[in-house]
Amino acid sequence: DKFAINEKGGYLYVLPTSNTGSQPVNSLHVLDKDMNEVGVINEIARGESIYAARFVGKYVYFITYRQTDPLFVADISNPTAPKLLGELEVSGFSEYLHMWDDTHVLGIGYGDSQQSKIKLTMFDVSDPTKPVEVNQKLIDSSESWSNEFVYNYKAILADPEKNLIGFTAN
């Protein structure tokens, strides 16, 4: 995911999925200006892969995918001691996360592993230890659709002021 890397306050934050063993494993690494690791969270969602991430303020929100499809919230306010705060398992998976407002994250992806339904999800993250799926919308998809939002986040319109969400689908 192109949003799984972020620079803030002289630190580089990276959310890689490693496939070196029998199962993928995820982690959060914090590097200083000399590229020394100063903070880490290891062993996040073993057997799954990170599909979407968004760094906002002192938090990083990310979605993994395989058997279960959780939204994770991690606190990165202290670069030397990042903490995993909350997790919410939901059906489907998001390919893109967008901060809707101070307390809501919009997820755009699929409602099932066959990608037969596009899924819009609104997460309430006002309590980062207990994220909640407050709304979802499933839209029928088909093999002939070209869901550009999966590869190009610029194909998504998310306008909280006008309460609009749009994306391309051919």
Task: List PLM regions with ranges.
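Feature marking well-ordered beta-strand scaffolds used for ligand recognition
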Residues: D1-N170
